[in-house]
A protein has these predicted regions:
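C-terminal boundary and immediately downstream tail of ABC-type ATPase nucleotide-binding domains
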Residues: 62-84, 112
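A generic structural signal for short coil/turn motifs at secondary-structure boundaries
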Residues: 3-4, 69, 120
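Small-residue-enriched segments and motifs
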Residues: 13, 67, 79-81, 129-134
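Non-catalytic connector elements of ABC transporters
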Residues: 76, 87-193
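ABC ATPase nucleotide-binding domains
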Residues: 1-65
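Residues that scaffold the ATP/ADP-binding catalytic core of kinase and kinase-like folds
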Residues: 60-63, 72, 121, 189
């Protein structure tokens, strides 16, 4: 963690080469979701010393199933939910009805979506929320917006990340009127017991 980005990338490439040649099992302990994703084909996610879930790394990042596991894999956007139908939920904290690709289980407690998977839109529609900017953060290669449902009230904001086109672009030009929550990227979650 004390290495600069360039040296860390070189070390990680060397580590990947070593792992590609190694034929046995290994255990990698890391607090970096990026390292876990890069180096591990299978993953066990721990919270407070307890195993939350185990499985293929890409599948766990896509569908962690458990709220705490989604947090540990870096998801920032969560809402408590009410099941409304076989493929529909009401996201209480966002004041938003959502249609889901997956069948909604009876024990669902939350929905999550990664900030990189949401899409900006100029018009409303299914799984769209009219938004206003609460906060903006500029990083080297992306814009990060904290967006809130324009309905107001006690709605919780969501993080939306989008790549920069160049270093000079105006971040206000990227702000959409609506944000779209693609149904294929909605994570239906339950709390660990």
């Amino acid at each position: 963690s004390a290495l600069d980005g360039y040296l860390k990338d070189i070390m990680q490439r060397d580590m990947q080469n070593f792992l590609n040649e190694y034929t046995g099992d290994m255990i990698l302990v890391t607090h970096s979701r990026d390292e876990a994703y890069k180096f591990c084909g299978h993953l066990t996610i721990l919270d407070s010393g307890q195993a939350l879930t185990t499985g293929e790394t890409k599948k766990l990042f896509e569908r962690p199933g458990i709220l705490q596991a989604a947090r540990l894999t870096g998801c920032k956007n969560f809402s408590t939910v009410q099941k409304m139908g076989k493929h529909s939920i009401y996201a209480v904290d966002w004041d938003l009805m959502l249609q889901t690709k997956d069948v909604v289980p009876d024990d669902v407690t939350h929905v999550g979506i990664r900030g990189h998977w949401m899409k900006g839109a100029s018009e409303g529609g299914e799984n769209h929320m009219e938004v206003e900017v609460v906060e903006y953060i500029e990083t080297t290669f992306e814009h990060q917006y904290l967006l809130k449902n324009k309905k107001g009230g006690d709605c919780q904001p969501v993080w939306w990340m989008c790549p920069k086109g160049n270093f000079e672009e105006d971040p206000r030009a990227k702000v959409p009127k609506y944000i779209h929550f693609p149904e294929e990227h909605l994570m239906l979650l339950k709390e660990a017991k």
